[in-house]
């Protein structure tokens, strides 16, 4: 909960007293002027400051060499935090820890960091995760939030990498080699030298502190370097065999002390060790070799290291790292070597390991399943992408060229030129973000994106050809925005695969996380949104995690990015209003309680508008791209222009996302007043539809919280904005900036309370007051909320209205022998899918579900006495083909459904009898 300030200052009291009374009729009561004041609101000077300060706090500041003005700000922050009841629970007693956190907040806000983060940790004896868990409970500025996020991401990556290095060294080096070696060189020394060398290389090569993949590839290069320097007697297989051709026969370290110069060229050119490492860790050998030759070797040559026992001197390496550490003023990663408690994490909440369940059946074959570490997870994800793209090309296939040739205007040359031009821009931007030495890495990523781009484009065109029986897609394939969006989506899949940005919150990703790709391609978020659904449907091999990632990108666009001032969305809305008028605007006439039909194609979205406003009795549907082009061309000749498919679908999805979030918040805050949810939703939906300018450069959740607060006020429900904000912070996608920094007017930002009072309530005052009258407005329909508009390939499929679940057992991904794959069944999975082996396959279960659901729907409609519309597809039961071997007969008056149901019942009876007979036979044999 954000901290409160119980004692108002004189200035605040005067401001409150000076507020003019609201004219009648009274507007919704506004929030108390006492707000969540951040650290920037605290005064820098205070009378008799030293007298109020505790001696231990002063001593802590002296140890950290804190300037006076930072110390004063930190103490005032402490007073503010400690005055709030229940916010930090029992932690208030641990003053030293909270003092340190307050010092950190003040130092970041004032840009006066006179200490390193590790120094602060050591002085208050606190771990990284505990520090940040406490900090999250305190209301801090965006500046502090960003600093905290950067440090935590860096820590998470370093923790994962050190854990990986430690385990890998155990697999490479002998812990107890012969006595002649152990006195001068051992595995502990190699680990220490390798880790510090890696830290130096990472700091030099990478500008991004939280890139996990390139960092791990760099770590493999470090391992390769020191394996080659190590005596073979110190190594385990297969490294011992691989290193002998380089180092010669096993020798004592004293005889090999001066061999570094002799094998310098071999270190640069021999790749046998790096190939073994890549095979063991299932890394792409070409990518690692690129990092090795382009980045690592030049870095090592620039160090000019002095060696001892064939290894660089630890003191020399440590001194070089000390300079980087003091400059960055953050974590001293050398402490990982000592397993320092400030860098350890709780074993239960460990970021580093999430182990898979053990097999319960001891008779089953035991597969050794490695722990799912961050490195292993991202490597598996990359390998899955490679499996998809192995057969793909970074040039258009023959099928694609055939489609190009069938176009009225051949798009081939423009497509190739666009791909080439964007490639230069992408590599430049990638190197700027990651490091200037990483241009070639950017080129490799771009080539993967281009492969996926051509692959998905071909899949889209094939699907359209099968659906429409046409091959001329000239208008779509000559649309620049379509190609830019499709290429951007392919590149986003690649970038997300190589990063950890597939987390729940996109803001917690790396510098290359979405919407980075939009900035690189200078693409509007609303245009990018149009391709997401078609992309997912066209590429059936996307992993569940990647589909979820693209869905989160879609949510990010719908909640804020599509509402930026320069977005084409506002022009589209204005055109829609001008054409159709306020009564037929957007989705006002569309039933929101119906499921969202995902049958929109790229042509629908990018050649929109593609359909005329429907007239009564009209059943015409524009499906073909050719028709779409004709419709778009003739739009200017009709009296009433065409509707926009892309805008219509966008608003449907926005409404569903908005209601889902509102529903979650209402369940947490208004469980005792469930009737208010529908009213709040009506105001919320009205604002999005009719006052959409309030969304310009703002966030969907800001309108949601204001709608909730306004309705609660007119309904006399005591719900403070602070309570709403506190509950909102617990939502998985929430970031504090959403309620701390809201646009008030051009280039002026303030808290959400100020936005409500000065903007939202002023615009919607009349509408809000209607809900307090005896004749409130008609309530808006509640949107139908599906679990997800996209089907995940590995998810159990639940058919609405039925009780049978079908779980696909096959996956296109097979990692490698010895590793778990989705195709390997466990005893648990066998039980889930084997429901009567003689009955049939999952397709039969699907048919049963279809039959039951359709028949239930028909019976229900018949009972209501209505004439239901004809279904798109009829269930046809072939009576002549029925199985009467069991002697079942059908009465003349029976419906087809009743006949089929009787057959199913009979079949099940036969199965049960067969099982009973089998059981009796088995028991008889045992008795004999």
Curated annotation (Swiss-Prot):
Residues 640-771 are annotated as: Domain B. Residues 8-19 have a biased composition (Low complexity). Changing residue 860 to R: Abolishes monomethylation by SMYD2 and subsequent interaction with L3MBTL1. It is found in: Nucleus; Cytoplasm. A motif (Bipartite nuclear localization signal) lies at residues 860-876. Phosphorylated by CDK6 and CDK4, and subsequently by CDK2 at Ser-567 in G1, thereby releasing E2F1 which is then able to activate cell growth. Dephosphorylated at the late M phase. SV40 large T antigen, HPV E7 and adenovirus E1A bind to the underphosphorylated, active form of pRb. Phosphorylation at Thr-821 and Thr-826 promotes interaction between the C-terminal domain C and the Pocket domain, and thereby inhibits interactions with heterodimeric E2F/DP transcription factor complexes. Dephosphorylated at Ser-795 by calcineruin upon calcium stimulation. The modification N6-acetyllysine is found at residues 873-874. The modification Phosphothreonine is found at residues 252, 356, 373, 821, 823, 826, 841. Residues 373-771 are annotated as: Pocket. Expressed in the retina. Expressed in foreskin keratinocytes (at protein level). The modification N,N-dimethylproline is found at residue 2. Residues 915-928 have a biased composition (Basic and acidic residues). The modification N6-methyllysine is found at residues 810, 860. Coiled coil: none annotated. Residues 373-579 are annotated as: Domain A. Tumor suppressor that is a key regulator of the G1/S transition of the cell cycle. The hypophosphorylated form binds transcription regulators of the E2F family, preventing transcription of E2F-responsive genes. Both physically blocks E2Fs transactivating domain and recruits chromatin-modifying enzymes that actively repress transcription. Cyclin and CDK-dependent phosphorylation of RB1 induces its dissociation from E2Fs, thereby activating transcription of E2F responsive genes and triggering entry into S phase. (Microbial infection) In case of viral infections, interactions with SV40 large T antigen, HPV E7 protein or adenovirus E1A protein induce the disassembly of RB1-E2F1 complex thereby disrupting RB1's activity. It is linked to Childhood cancer retinoblastoma: Congenital malignant tumor that arises from the nuclear layers of the retina. It occurs in about 1:20'000 live births and represents about 2% of childhood malignancies. It is bilateral in about 30% of cases. Although most RB appear sporadically, about 20% are transmitted as an autosomal dominant trait with incomplete penetrance. The diagnosis is usually made before the age of 2 years when strabismus or a gray to yellow reflex from pupil ('cat eye') is investigated. Bladder cancer: A malignancy originating in tissues of the urinary bladder. It often presents with multiple tumors appearing at different times and at different sites in the bladder. Most bladder cancers are transitional cell carcinomas that begin in cells that normally make up the inner lining of the bladder. Other types of bladder cancer include squamous cell carcinoma (cancer that begins in thin, flat cells) and adenocarcinoma (cancer that begins in cells that make and release mucus and other fluids). Bladder cancer is a complex disorder with both genetic and environmental influences. This is Retinoblastoma-associated protein.
